[in-house]
Amino acid sequence: MLKILHTADWHLGKRLQEYSRIAEQKLVLEEICQIADQEEVDLVLLAGDIFDTFNPSHEAVELLYKTLRRLSKNGTRPVVAISGNHDSSQFVEAPDPLARELGILFYSRYDSIISCGTLDGGMEISQSDSGFVELRLPKLDFPIRILLAPYANEVSLRTYLGEENREEAFRELLGQNWQQLADRYCDENGVNLFMGHFFFVEEGSTTPPDAEPESERPILHVGGTQSLFTQQLPNT
């Protein structure tokens, strides 16, 4: 049996006006680490909005690295993290060459591919592609396949989008890409996962999304994505 801890929206470095919330965040992350150990979790997924700003404080960055190192158990438990709409994609991927030796994989750009190979902790990155990674752990006799869908705005995908029907083109592009990856790499002989940082609704839904707080960077509109349809999630 595979045990997964899924977490997201840490917003490290968040401030409430002039007050830092780093002390609260340390307590929450300590509890997450304890749960991962108590439940003997095999895999940790961190699904975006790791930081609260594009340029996080030194204290926030230090807290992230210390927490992920604990969660990875010195490279014996994989941690896979993607960027959200609050994160800088370049900043998130910056420590990847060092972090991967501890089994920590960052992914934030659709044009990047995680390098394959066996790490010191025993984890093997057996297959990878743009938006996809397959992991093999020594204790498991089946692979773990993860479709990686970090937040992406229309600017980052502008080469694929026309001026007209931009919203429809964006949805179609992502949905087709996810399905192609699922068809190519996923089958019943492994555990197939999708990890993304988007806003999904059912097509034709008449229920408007909840209003975002003024302090939130919008995930819908203002250069961000429109909502995606649940029908665009891949079938395996």
Regions found by a protein language model. Give the residues of each.
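Short N-terminal secondary-structure initiator segments
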Residues: 1, 15-16, 76-103
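N-terminal active-site segment of His-dependent metallophosphoesterases
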Residues: 1-69, 73-76
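Active-site neighborhood of divalent metal-dependent phosphoester/pyrophosphate hydrolases
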Residues: 11, 41-59, 76-90, 200-204, ...
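Short secondary-structure boundary micro-motifs
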Residues: 27, 80-81, 118
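Short, charged helix-to-loop "capping" segments that act as catalytic/coupling loops
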Residues: 71-78, 109, 114
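His/Asp/Glu-rich metal-coordinating catalytic cores
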Residues: 87-236
